[in-house]
A protein has these predicted regions:
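Membrane-proximal intracellular helices of multi-pass ion channels
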Residues: 1-359
């Protein structure tokens, strides 16, 4: 009987997929309700479905302007969908259980481990709790800092909501905005504070919770006079790739666009292109070369266990290492450690599938 029951249980990956499908169905129903619509423009079932899928998958693509088409209720629904999409339905559910002092089953631990790309089964409950606290703390700080931008252009109550929504959308790499202008966040193209806050939120969300937790642990040890441990190999690769993609991407965008974009605009475009989807400069104004750079950044995306998508920075790194290894005939190594053949094969398969799907 137990064997039959085990066979009938869905794998962690299937449970995660089923959870997302359930959230998409619920979100579509809620956004289809009249209470979710502002009445300023028509919102059909397909618009509601598209908005839901885009929010849960944190892509930032829209068929109707979020700020103009949806009421406050609809915008709250989208914000929740962005939060679920960034954290993951299983991680979010398990996080509330952990925060309330509950215990996760062995199966629950397995599902969360799969969702967050956690390497072991030990300390999962504590890890989930820290992820939840870290997530909401960063979003709260982001909302507070964003408020000083929006309050200059909108009434206080409106500025508060715009700040909260923007912080959630930025940290979860969602790309949605509720300004209702139709040009994303173009009105803040030259606002240095807005650009900095938004970029920091996007980058933090794209690093991955395990890397952020590791960095905070090192900072805490330093402040309390304890011995500071070394960064894990995963964290080193993620931080290195993030720096290369952000500044390398910005340099290429600036070189391809020249005087048509400022240095700040190039950095913002490089950061947001990887997974977020905000725009201070209209994409239609970019050259073909600039769009190609943006496309490469979009394919690579964020890091494992983060709020963003893409093939992941670590996969791109291992893939490039594999290519260099084949060309030079040398063993693929990273920070003096040999890269496993299995990891290189997985990276090659992921990149190949991504390219075939796009083409």
């Amino acid at each position: 009987m137990d064997n039959v029951r085990k066979k009938n249980l869905l794998s962690p990956a299937k449970v995660i997929a089923a959870g997302f499908l359930a959230v998409i169905a619920a979100g579509t129903i809620l956004l289809s309700l009249p209470v979710s619509h502002s009445g300023k423009c028509e919102v059909g079932f397909l618009d509601a479905l598209f908005s839901t899928v885009s929010a849960v998958c944190v892509t930032g693509l829209i068929t109707v302007d979020t700020g103009a088409a949806y009421s406050m209720f609809g915008q709250v629904v989208i914000a929740l969908l962005l939060q679920i999409g960034g954290l993951g339905i299983t991680s979010l559910g398990a996080g509330f259980v952990a925060l309330l002092g509950g215990k996760l089953s062995t199966r629950g631990n397995s599902i969360v481990r799969e969702a967050l790309n956690y390497p072991t089964y030990s300390g999962i409950r504590q890890m989930i709790r820290s992820v939840m606290v870290l997530d909401f703390s960063i979003e709260a700080i982001g909302a507070f800092l964003s408020f000083f931008v929006f309050v200059k252009d909108y009434p206080v109550k409106t500025a508060v909501w715009y700040s909260v929504f923007h912080s959630i959308a930025a940290f979860n790499n969602g790309g949605f905005d509720v300004l209702g202008r139709g040009d994303s966040v173009g009105m803040y193209t030259h606002n240095v504070w807005f650009n900095i806050v938004t970029c920091v939120l996007i980058v933090l969300g794209g690093l991955g919770f395990l890397v952020m937790r590791e960095l905070l642990g090192m900072l805490s040890a330093k402040l309390h006079g304890r011995e500071v441990g070394k960064l894990s190999l995963h964290a080193k690769v993620v931080l290195m790739m993030t720096g290369i993609l952000v500044f390398g991407g910005a340099l290429l965008i600036k070189l391809t666009e020249g005087s048509n974009i400022s240095v700040m605009g190039a950095i913002f475009a490089s950061v947001t292109s990887r997974t977020a989807g905000f725009a201070t400069y209209p994409l239609g104004g970019f050259s073909n070369a600039g769009i190609l750079v943006i496309c490469v950044l979009m394919v690579i995306g964020a890091s494992p266990g983060s709020t963003g998508g893409g093939i992941k920075t670590t996969t791109a790194f291992v893939f490039v290492k594999r290519l260099v290894s084949v060309i030079t005939g040398r063993e693929a190594r990273v920070f003096r450690r040999k890269i496993k053949d299995e990891a290189m094969s997985q990276a090659f398969i992921i990149v190949s599938l991504a390219v075939m799907w796009i083409l």
